[in-house]
């Protein structure tokens, strides 16, 4: 068996008619199948929930984020919501410290005019080297203070004295002395020791009454009456109930009548 040797063919020369050459090449290579739009099946198309890749639609992502945030405890959700809000805290106001000279000047103006006009406020602020807002605020506070002082007169003189008079501990002795003065006008009055008695000194009052009665009896009868100090456990009835030399100045002694 002999092998036929054929010389290699050179490049085929193309004719001037390109369409004829294209047809000849297509007939030699065989028919090629080109896909048509109808060849695509409905199953190969991605559905509404399927995408080409691992990405998910934004609606599904937002639903998952909402579900995840709902699982958080209430304090964390509150802090998460507050962290997104802007910081609306105001800076604290700075109080103006007036000097004594400024306060004296403002008080002098307030005594004449409690309300300032805009021109007067501007002039006063320029003279005192303050702002109009500071002048206006000071006058507002001063008017409120003046109103409180007018409503409560005690604010004018807080240390003028006590509001209530102290109780009189010498009412009994003074009434007794007045009665003795009416009975015996020439009897001397008792000294001021009754005014110096401390509160609650019952025996001191009795002693003063005894001395007053003794002095009155001596002036009436010519000799002093016997006065006995109170004994513990037995109240003293005073010298008015003791015996005396005359019936005009002494009362009968009390005893067991029955």
Curated annotation (Swiss-Prot):
Query: Can you list the GO cellular component terms from the UniProt entry?
Result: chromatin; nucleoplasm
- Ranges of compositional bias, category Polar residues: 1-32
Q: Which UniProt keywords apply?
A: Developmental protein, DNA-binding, Homeobox, Nucleus
Q: A Pfam family in this protein?
A: Homeodomain
Q: Which GO terms describe its biological process?
A: cell differentiation; positive regulation of transcription by RNA polymerase II; regulation of transcription by RNA polymerase II
Residues annotated as region Disordered? 1-93, 227-248
A Gene Ontology molecular-function term? DNA-binding transcription factor activity, RNA polymerase II-specific
Q: Which residues bind DNA?
A: 91-150
Could you name the domain of life of the organism this protein comes from?
Answer: Eukaryota
Chief location bin: nucleus
User: What are the subcellular locations of this protein?
Assistant: Nucleus
Alphabetical list of InterPro entries matching this protein: HD (IPR001356), Homeobox_CS (IPR017970), Homeobox_TF (IPR050848), Homeodomain-like_sf (IPR009057)
The entry's note on the tissues where this protein occurs is:
Expressed in bone marrow of patients recovering from chemotherapy. Also expressed in an erythroleukemia cell line.
* Free-text function comment from the UniProt entry: May be involved in ventralization.
Q: What is this protein called?
A: Homeobox protein VENTX
């Amino acid at each position: 068996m002999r092998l036929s040797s054929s010389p290699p063919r050179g490049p085929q020369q193309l004719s001037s008619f390109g369409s004829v050459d294209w047809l000849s090449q297509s007939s030699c290579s065989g028919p090629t199948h080109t896909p048509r739009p109808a060849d695509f099946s409905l199953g190969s198309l991605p559905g509404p929930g399927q995408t080409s890749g691992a990405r998910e639609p934004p609606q599904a992502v937002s639903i998952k984020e909402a579900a995840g945030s709902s699982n958080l405890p209430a304090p964390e959700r509150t802090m998460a919501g507050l962290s997104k809000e802007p910081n609306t805290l105001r800076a604290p106001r700075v109080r103006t410290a007036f000097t004594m000279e400024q306060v004296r000047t403002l008080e002098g103006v307030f005594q004449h005019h409690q309300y300032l006009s805009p021109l007067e406020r501007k002039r006063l602020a320029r003279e005192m080297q303050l702002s109009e807002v500071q002048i206006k605020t000071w006058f507002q506070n001063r008017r409120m203070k003046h109103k409180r002082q007018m409503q409560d007169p005690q604010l004018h003189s807080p240390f003028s004295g006590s509001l209530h008079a102290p109780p009189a501990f010498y009412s009994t002795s003074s009434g007794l002395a007045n009665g003795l003065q009416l009975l015996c006008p020439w009897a001397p009055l008792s000294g001021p020791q009754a005014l110096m008695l401390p509160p609650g000194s019952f025996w001191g009052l009795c002693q003063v009454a005894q001395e007053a009665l003794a002095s009155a009896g001596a002036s009436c009868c010519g000799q002093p009456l016997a006065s006995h100090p109170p004994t513990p456990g037995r109240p003293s009835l005073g010298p008015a109930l003791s015996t005396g030399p005359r019936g005009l100045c002494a009362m009968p002694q009390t005893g067991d009548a029955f």
